[in-house]
């Protein structure tokens, strides 16, 4: 019975202290993302969003090209 009490006390103390130290930045982010400035919403986060978008698109294109290559390779049987 002691173990659940100790773990519950640790969880409660960690969650309450962490919650008090964080600043609520939701209104700032809402203002940023709701601004009508012509930038797509998936790029409004800054440089990190630009890099993440480019990497994601590169991986998607690379995966698609590799899938087409594998299908083409599998569709032509080897000569024995």
From Swiss-Prot:
- Residues on the membrane's Mitochondrial matrix side span 22-46
Transmembrane residue ranges: 47-75
Name of the protein in question: Cytochrome c oxidase subunit 7A1, mitochondrial
Q: In which pathway does it act?
A: Energy metabolism; oxidative phosphorylation
The answer on whether this UniProt entry bears the keyword Chloroplast reads no
GO MF term list: oxidoreductase activity
Record key words, sorted: Membrane, Mitochondrion, Mitochondrion inner membrane, Oxidoreductase, Transit peptide, Transmembrane, Transmembrane helix
Presequence range in chain numbering: 1-21
Q: Which residues lie on this side of the membrane: Mitochondrial intermembrane?
A: 76-80
Q: Where in the cell is it found?
A: Mitochondrion inner membrane
Self-association state and partner proteins as the record states? Component of the complex IV (CIV, cytochrome c oxidase), a multisubunit enzyme composed of 14 subunits. The complex is composed of a catalytic core of 3 subunits MT-CO1, MT-CO2 and MT-CO3, encoded in the mitochondrial DNA, and 11 supernumerary subunits COX4I1 (or COX4I2), COX5A, COX5B, COX6A2 (or COX6A1), COX6B1 (or COX6B2), COX6C, COX7A1 (or COX7A2), COX7B, COX7C, COX8B and NDUFA4, which are encoded in the nuclear genome.
Protein function: Component of the mitochondrial respiratory complex IV (CIV, also named cytochrome c oxidase complex), the last enzyme in the mitochondrial electron transport chain which drives oxidative phosphorylation. The CIV complex is the component of the respiratory chain that catalyzes the reduction of oxygen to water. Acts as an assembly factor that specifically drives the homodimerization of CIV complexes, mediating the formation of mitochondrial respiratory supercomplexes (respirasomes) containing two CIV: supercomplxes with two molecules of CIV show improved activity.
Q: Does the keyword Transit peptide apply?
A: yes
Record the organism.
Saimiri sciureus
* Membrane topology annotation: Single-pass membrane protein
Please give the GO cellular component terms listed in this UniProt entry: mitochondrial inner membrane; respiratory chain complex IV
Q: Which GO terms describe its biological process?
A: mitochondrial electron transport, cytochrome c to oxygen; mitochondrial respirasome assembly; regulation of oxidative phosphorylation
Q: Which family does it belong to?
A: Belongs to the cytochrome c oxidase VIIa family.
